[in-house]
């Protein structure tokens, strides 16, 4: 009762109150790969400052949890560990960060298992990552790589670019991934396989718009009862969008989701895709108070009023960390 009496009363009349957005598929690299033949490695301090600025931008646009994947350049590189160290140095301020290592593939071949095992040992020892992303097309049920991941107690995510649905089913059975990064042009058979699995399918609405992809598989997967999530697909070298409000709008206008489905896909479903849904992604008792106050009368206006940052206030762990509204604490 004492805590309730001491709490600040924040007026939100005429606003939308919702959980913070969760973006599970942001990709970062230590290399400036504009020159594909001779990518240049960034200075660690420069990368750190750029990443902090990016996380602040996410906060200002309503993304309170970001899944960061270390993206290799020209296959497997030791720079991934250095990148994840810098992200661990940033920690969970200004936003929550779930770090993942994306294993690089060279010509469709897996990097040396010894190098992978050494990297996994380092990641686990220093708590630099909790997830590892694999290419589903390169996976076998008897893979020594899966044994390594199991021993390292790492969650698995798959990268699937569409092919034989039987191959997808085998990969899902072998790896039991938390999530699968997919294109939006999946076949109906692939949608059925994903719908029957316990994995969350993650789609990039922004990329589908640029590539003029049909995007009908999201609706098909949702109708089949599958779990789907949305990501901005941010990549510093190719896709610079990190605004999840924009992603929700595109999912409704281009990918045939309802507003409710798009919001669920960018909050609670995305949180479960990164195995943090028990703490984040919805406004429930015993969950962390990660809350957005949007300057909208109705949540259904979000896709209709495209191009405006509607975030008026951000609350993290019960504390106001961003206030763009007219209300001030002294006015309480």
Regions found by a protein language model. Give the residues of each.
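His/Asp/Glu-enriched, well-ordered alpha-helical/loop segment
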Residues: 153, 218-296
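Histidine/acidic-residue-rich catalytic or RNA/ligand-binding cores of hydrolases
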Residues: 77, 110, 140-144, 164-174, ...
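Catalytic beta/alpha-barrel core
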Residues: 131-138, 155-162, 177-188, 202-210
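C-terminal cap of metal-dependent C-N hydrolases
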Residues: 268, 285-332
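Divalent metal-coordination and catalytic microenvironments
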Residues: 14, 25, 62, 69, ...
């Amino acid at each position: 009762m004492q805590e309730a009496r001491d709490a600040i009363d924040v007026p939100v009349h005429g606003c939308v109150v919702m959980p913070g957005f969760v973006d599970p598929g942001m990709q970062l690299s230590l290399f400036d790969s504009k020159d594909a033949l001779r990518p240049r490695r960034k200075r660690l301090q420069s990368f750190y400052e750029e990443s902090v600025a990016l996380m602040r931008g996410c906060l200002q646009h309503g993304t309170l949890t970001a899944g960061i994947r270390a993206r290799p350049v020209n296959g497997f590189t030791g720079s991934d560990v250095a990148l994840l160290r810098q992200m661990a140095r940033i920690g969970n301020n200004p936003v929550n960060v779930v770090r993942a290592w994306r294993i690089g593939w060279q010509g469709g071949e897996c990097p040396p298992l010894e190098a992978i095992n050494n990297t996994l040992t380092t990641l686990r020892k220093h708590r630099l990552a909790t997830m590892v992303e694999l290419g589903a097309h390169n996976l076998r049920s008897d893979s020594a790589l899966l044994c390594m991941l199991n021993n390292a107690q790492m969650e698995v995510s798959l990268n699937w670019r569409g092919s034989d649905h039987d191959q997808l089913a085998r990969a899902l059975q072998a790896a039991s991934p938390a999530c699968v990064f997919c294109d939006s042009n999946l076949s109906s058979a692939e949608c059925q396989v994903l719908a029957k699995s316990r994995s969350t399918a993650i789609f990039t609405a922004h990329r589908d718009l640029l590539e003029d992809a049909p995007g009908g598989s999201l609706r098909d997967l949702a109708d089949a009862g599958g779990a789907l999530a949305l990501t901005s697909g941010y990549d510093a070298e190719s896709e610079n969008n990190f605004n999840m409000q924009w992603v929700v709008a595109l999912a409704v206008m281009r990918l045939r989701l309802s507003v409710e489905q798009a919001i669920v896909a960018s909050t609670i479903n995305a949180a479960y895709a990164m195995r943090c849904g028990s703490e984040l992604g919805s406004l429930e008792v015993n969950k962390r108070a990660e809350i957005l106050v949007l300057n909208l009368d109705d949540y259904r206006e979000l896709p209709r009023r495209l191009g405006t940052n509607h975030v008026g206030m951000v609350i993290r762990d019960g504390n106001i960390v961003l206030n763009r509204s007219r209300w001030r604490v002294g006015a309480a």
